[in-house]
Each structure stands twice: as C-alpha cells, then as structure tokens.
C-alpha cells in the first residue's frame, strides 16, 4: 500500500466526464515537437533513401536461400553492405551505437529445405538515462519472386522491403549522433518471406535476456502511396496496424478481459494511439485496428508472440502486380518489384513518422507498470494504483479516460507524482488509463489497469 503522501483524490462530475475535451483538458499524448525533434525530421533525406533502395536492388536477388558468399549478388552481399553502412553511421555516435551481425542456423522448416544461416544486422543506440528501456524498428532485407522457393531469379524487392530497410538505415544515420534517453535498436532482419525467421530469433533473444522492449515497429512495404492504377489517392497516408486483444494473452487473462472489457486497450493498441498523437505534419497515420492485413503478417508478429507491444507500418494501397512477382511484361503490364515504382519522398515521410514516434517514446518516461483498479470494495468512485517510475526527470502522472464506445482517450487529468489516486467516476461507465509525464512535458503511452487481486 502506498503511503498517504503518494495518494491523491480527484473529483470529476458526471457532467464533466461526458462533456467535450475542453472541460477536462486535452487527452492527446503529443506535445509540440521540440527543437531537437524538428532538426531530426529535417535531416531525413529522400535522396539518401533512394540510394539505399537502389543499392539493395543492385544485388539482383536477396532471397534468404541465395548466395551468402558472392561479393556482388545475393543476400550475403546485401548483408555485408548493410553492415558496413551501419558501422559507418555508428562512427558518428561517440561509441554509443554498436553494430552486430546476429546469425543463427535455421533448421529445416516450411520454406527452408536445408539448414540455412540467417543473419540480422542490428545497430543499437544506447540510451543515456534509462538504457534498459528498449525501442525497436525493423525492415526486412530479404526478397522473393512468384515462387517463394526460387532463389535464382532476380528479386529486386524495392518496395518489399528495401523501402523498409531504407527507413531503418536512414533513421540510424540521423539518430547516431543524438543522445536518446532510452535505447533505440535499428534492425535489418532476414528470413521474413520464408516465415519471419529472423525477427522470430531476434524477439526470442530479447525474451531470453529479459529485455524491456516497450515498443517495436515493423516497416514493411512502405514504398509508395500510388494506387494500382497509378493515381495517388493517399500519398500522404501510411497505415499502422495494431492488434487489440494481445496475441500473447493467456487463458487466465482472457477470462479477466471477458469480465471487465478492454478488447481495445492492449499495449499495442495504446502504442497506436501514441503514434497518432505524435505524428508529424505532412503525413496522416491511418491506424487500423487489426493485427495486420487480412490473413497476412510481418515481423511485428514475432514480437507480439513474446508479449511485446508492436505495430506494422505499410503503404495505403498495395500494388499486387509489383509484389511477390517475377520481373516480366505481360499483356503490356510491367510486373515485378522495381525501384522505378517507389516514391522516395513518400518513404522519407514514413521515416519521419517513425522518427517522431521513436524519439518521443525514447525521451518520455516508460509506460507505467503495475496499473490496477482497486476492487476490494464496491464503490461508485474508482481507485487506481501503479508503481512509481524511477526516471530522474519524472514529473508525475495523468489519468486518462473515455466513454466505452469511444476509440481514443477523451479526457485527461494531471494527478501529480503519486502512485495512487481516487477519482469520483465509476469504473463501470468508462475505460481508464495512466500515463507518465516528465519535466519537459513528454508523455508515455497509457497503460490500461487490470483489476487488483
């Protein structure tokens, strides 16, 4: 039980709870971008992104089963080039960024006919205040054609997924000289097209280490806002897929959820709300309440399976003549995932969305832990408790809430640097969350409470 000095009581009338946002203060997590974040966004360059995409395409194929020792063609050549570039970026970090090759042998598996070495290229920018808190961003550098087992034909993979790797590498370049408070990890993973093998290994390695991964973003197919007919219906929109009910939910957790609700309050759904709140100008993040596209997947699922909050960025409308296709012209239509179909200004905008989200997360306090609603007695008020964070610049907490039918937080109230608060609102009628705030006004994602045991 927290001491009395760590408690607060907040009275909110029923009328205020149902009133417009202005009645209780805005609930958005975002603040005006800092000068440092604005500088970061300005440094992201479409021409550098284009150079990365074209270089990756130049390796002919990056199929997971292609050559690993040919110096100019195949996944090994791509791996070595990405590693060398990441090392070059790290040279500007003053030792804060390290680069590694995370290799493992994938045994015979679906789409892996023989034991195969798979390698992730990982650059880690160590946090300056809470380095144990980790945020991950990935793109996959392997590619494929129509036959997922064909490791010989050219598989340029410009959109899927040189575009995502370009986002990751450009972020690593721009942020290498910065000092984020938490650790940011930039990873080009392999084996995605064969079964998410690279990200699966990476996520399991974090789980085995007990790593505190508080968010992960997969950038997969982020190359253009063009539609299949060549128009640009949404060239300033990027989709963000976020699950509701956690993939890792246990049977016991499901039983509780069915009793108290919260299908839209899992950690990944809160991450989606956060990204929307801090999106930079010039790009609309369209949050989709689904784990991924219909019956499909990407590397974020590997992290969701381990209980880590994760989401997937992807372009607004995929062109299936360019995706998973042999390069050819058929009935006057050009098939294949070619660099000429990428919009490098668009990819740069996606990179800026990622940068705003990652930097805002890393500079804010961590997501509150141990958030519960006191259920020891029947009352029309609600008592919330949580663990006080240890960040040196932690200023306090905010309680947020919304109607049960609302998609996003509607109201917020600052409650101070306490670990318990009683609010004159019924837990029956609204959904609550708690988020941390630092001295500069950076807010964490909200954490939804569980019933106390």
Task: Give, region by region, the residue ranges found by the protein language model.
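Beta-strand-rich modules
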Residues: 424-442
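Alpha-helical metal-binding/catalytic segments enriched in His/Glu/Asp
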Residues: 137, 142-143, 148-196, 354
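Conserved aromatic anchor
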Residues: 382-392
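Active-site-adjacent mobile loop/cap segments within catalytic or ligand-binding domains
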Residues: 57, 222-239, 288-365
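N-terminal secretory signal peptides and thylakoid transit peptides that target proteins
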Residues: 1-17
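Extracellular fibronectin type III
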Residues: 439-453
């Amino acid at each position: 039980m927290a001491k009395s000095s760590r408690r607060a009581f907040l009275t909110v009338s029923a009328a205020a709870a149902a009133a417009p946002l202005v009645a209780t203060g805005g609930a958005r997590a975002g603040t005006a971008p800092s000068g440092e974040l604005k500088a970061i966004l300005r440094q992201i360059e479409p021409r550098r992104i284009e150079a990365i995409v074209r270089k990756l395409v130049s390796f002919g194929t990056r199929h997971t089963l292609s050559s690993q020792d040919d110096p100019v063609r195949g996944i090994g050549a791509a791996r070595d080039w990405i590693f060398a570039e990441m090392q070059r970026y790290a040279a500007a970090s003053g030792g804060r960024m390290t680069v590694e090759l995370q290799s493992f042998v994938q045994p015979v598996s679906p789409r892996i006919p023989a034991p195969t070495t798979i390698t992730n290229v990982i650059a880690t920018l160590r946090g300056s205040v809470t380095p144990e808190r980790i945020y991950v961003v990935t793109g996959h550098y392997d590619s494929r054609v129509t036959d997922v087992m064909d490791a010989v034909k050219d598989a340029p993979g410009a959109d899927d997924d040189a575009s995502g790797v370009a986002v990751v590498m450009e972020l690593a370049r721009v942020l290498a000289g910065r000092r984020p408070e938490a650790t940011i990890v930039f990873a080009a993973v392999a084996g995605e097209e064969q079964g998410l093998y690279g990200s699966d290994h990476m996520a399991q390695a974090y789980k085995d280490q007990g790593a505190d991964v508080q968010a992960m973003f997969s950038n997969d197919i982020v190359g253009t806002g063009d539609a299949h007919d060549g128009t640009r219906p949404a060239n300033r929109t990027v989709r963000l897929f976020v699950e509701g009910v956690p993939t890792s939910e246990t049977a016991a957790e499901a039983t509780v959820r069915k009793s108290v609700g919260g299908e839209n309050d899992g950690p990944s759904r809160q991450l989606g709300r956060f990204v929307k709140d801090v999106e930079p100008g010039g790009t609309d993040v369209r949050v989709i309440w689904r784990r991924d596209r219909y019956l499909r997947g990407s590397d974020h699922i590997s992290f969701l399976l381990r209980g880590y909050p994760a989401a997937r960025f992807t372009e607004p409308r995929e062109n299936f003549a360019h995706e998973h296709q042999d390069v050819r012209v058929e009935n006057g239509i050009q098939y294949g995932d070619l660099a000429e179909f990428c919009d490098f200004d668009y990819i740069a905008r996606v990179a800026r969305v990622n940068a705003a989200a990652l930097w805002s997360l890393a500079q804010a306090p961590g997501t509150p832990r141990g958030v519960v609603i006191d259920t020891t007695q029947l009352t029309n008020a609600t008592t919330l408790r949580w663990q006080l964070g240890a960040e040196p610049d932690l200023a306090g907490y905010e309680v947020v809430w919304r109607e049960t039918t609302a998609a996003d937080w509607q109201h917020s109230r600052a409650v101070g640097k306490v670990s318990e608060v009683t609010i004159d609102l019924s837990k029956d009628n609204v959904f609550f969350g708690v988020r941390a705030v630092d001295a500069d006004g950076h807010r964490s994602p909200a954490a939804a409470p569980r019933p106390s045991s």
